[in-house]
């Protein structure tokens, strides 16, 4: 009998063990679909990005025109650009859902998988930020100026860091060139870290909605979950293509249709919607260094989740007090996102400050206290 090539060939065997015969808990729900959706988002972004890079010119005098040229003169250039710009939004929607699921079902207890996931989030945020600068519109230019200027808050070496990032004494041609280089390179770094993320995941096995060991009840990934993932792809691509075709600029900023002008400041400088929660936390502290530290902590606090877990149960499902806190925490970034999109004036300042305090208090203080209390109530 001839050996099964899928199981004997060195390369095919790796693919087979990761995507076909992978033992998967039989009861994982639709919340486990977001990992594969993130993979397809990354693939889509790399493909559309490579096509856009072929027509883009990383020069301050030509960048805006080259983007306009791509949309007007390149065959289906408008569609490729719209898919790339809105694909970034869907990428962040998927990753926020993915993190939320990990938080709710206690997946952060797989420490290595969780920590590489947080590194992936930080890399994705860096990639999206440098990408937003490339069209060289007003919001691109001023967003780059404001955010890179935050490095000046670093004691002693701050100003040198800023000038090193800019490649001069202001945001100019060298800045755009290095941002384009980073935006081209980082997605491949994300792909590499994703492989590490999956290696750690397959080492421990996937979590499940019951939070129990599922070794006795596993089924092959294909065809059961591969078909389920294809349904997920369809459910994601339908709204993405609808948005790209019917309302491509819905999530963008009108200021970015104006070429960058260093002499005219927009009335309200703000990043893309998926960064607004962190931007609101940055703005809530009135001095620069404190704001920068809070901005960094808003994402890096996720590294502490495995250390702050005090419950004897893995899941939040059977812990009503923790559930209440979880859904309060879920509502919090929506409030921060709304505040971040508003001008810096009363009452948005105080709302942002209260929401920022609530965000850190829930994660760092209330979750551990509540979990300890629940342990005592359940007599663990």
From Swiss-Prot:
Cofactor binding: number and manner: Binds 2 heme b groups non-covalently.
TM region(s), chain numbering: 34-54, 78-99, 114-134, 179-199, 227-247, 289-309, 321-341, 348-368
PROSITE patterns per record: CYTB_CTER, CYTB_NTER
Residues that bind a ubiquinone: 202
SUPFAM superfamilies: a domain/subunit of cytochrome bc1 complex (Ubiquinol-cytochrome c reductase), Transmembrane di-heme cytochromes
UniProt cofactor(s): heme b
Single GO term (MF): ubiquinol-cytochrome-c reductase activity
Any GO BP: mitochondrial electron transport, ubiquinol to cytochrome c
Topology relative to the membrane: Multi-pass membrane protein
Keywords (A to Z) from UniProt: Electron transport, Heme, Iron, Membrane, Metal-binding, Mitochondrion, Mitochondrion inner membrane, Respiratory chain, Transmembrane, Transmembrane helix, Transport, Ubiquinone
GO cellular component, as recorded: mitochondrial inner membrane; respiratory chain complex III
Residues binding heme b b566: 98, 197
Keyword Transmembrane helix: yes
Family: Belongs to the cytochrome b family.
Additional observations: Heme 1 (or BL or b562) is low-potential and absorbs at about 562 nm, and heme 2 (or BH or b566) is high-potential and absorbs at about 566 nm.
Quaternary structure and interacting proteins, as annotated: The cytochrome bc1 complex contains 11 subunits: 3 respiratory subunits (MT-CYB, CYC1 and UQCRFS1), 2 core proteins (UQCRC1 and UQCRC2) and 6 low-molecular weight proteins (UQCRH/QCR6, UQCRB/QCR7, UQCRQ/QCR8, UQCR10/QCR9, UQCR11/QCR10 and a cleavage product of UQCRFS1). This cytochrome bc1 complex then forms a dimer.
Entry function: Component of the ubiquinol-cytochrome c reductase complex (complex III or cytochrome b-c1 complex) that is part of the mitochondrial respiratory chain. The b-c1 complex mediates electron transfer from ubiquinol to cytochrome c. Contributes to the generation of a proton gradient across the mitochondrial membrane that is then used for ATP synthesis.
Protein name: Cytochrome b
